[in-house]
């Protein structure tokens, strides 16, 4: 069930679902696995906010266990494509593709709340069918693994070899460790400068 917010004005009351109300403040919330539905919604929201005001930052709050690599890359590419900076904030858990998107925020504008957890690892996948089909899927997973590792190395400043080693298995970090690693830029315990009216 999505909470409803009632807003009063001189013209009466108006009801909004909470996510629509947050969107008015340029806040997007990823609080679920990354799927085609969640990715399409987030991409559409970013494009809408860019069209509304290309100079004002967009805030992406992330509490996600990860999900589809392809859909996550669609969000990532849109974050890099839109003119406004996208500030990212981890609330709770940013794991797998969630951590990748957290790291994809504008440099200097990536943060985590103090009790959150961040986890990186290699992409997961599986294949069935004929040997040639399994080989095609295995090659694609290896391609994606290399692509994600190279982006993480670029965005964190870590050597590619370290990223490859650390993503071989689940690699959990505290917010302070994620700052040292280069995944985020700061740990916050108070609301960033913007505020919801």
Curated annotation (Swiss-Prot):
GO BP of this protein: protein quality control for misfolded or incompletely synthesized proteins
SUPFAM superfamilies: ClpP/crotonase (SSF52096)
Source domain of life: Bacteria
CC terms in the record's Gene Ontology section: cytoplasm; endopeptidase Clp complex
CDD domains reported in the protein's UniProt record: S14_ClpP_2
Catalytic activity annotation: Hydrolysis of proteins to small peptides in the presence of ATP and magnesium. alpha-casein is the usual test substrate. In the absence of ATP, only oligopeptides shorter than five residues are hydrolyzed (such as succinyl-Leu-Tyr-|-NHMec, and Leu-Tyr-Leu-|-Tyr-Trp, in which cleavage of the -Tyr-|-Leu- and -Tyr-|-Trp bonds also occurs)
Entry-linked PROSITE patterns: CLP_PROTEASE_SER (PS00381)
NCBIfam families found in the cross-reference section: clpP, PRK00277.1, PRK12551.1, PRK12553.1
Free-text function comment from the UniProt entry: Cleaves peptides in various proteins in a process that requires ATP hydrolysis. Has a chymotrypsin-like activity. Plays a major role in the degradation of misfolded proteins.
Binding partners and assembly: Fourteen ClpP subunits assemble into 2 heptameric rings which stack back to back to give a disk-like structure with a central cavity, resembling the structure of eukaryotic proteasomes.
Name of the protein this chain belongs to: ATP-dependent Clp protease proteolytic subunit 3
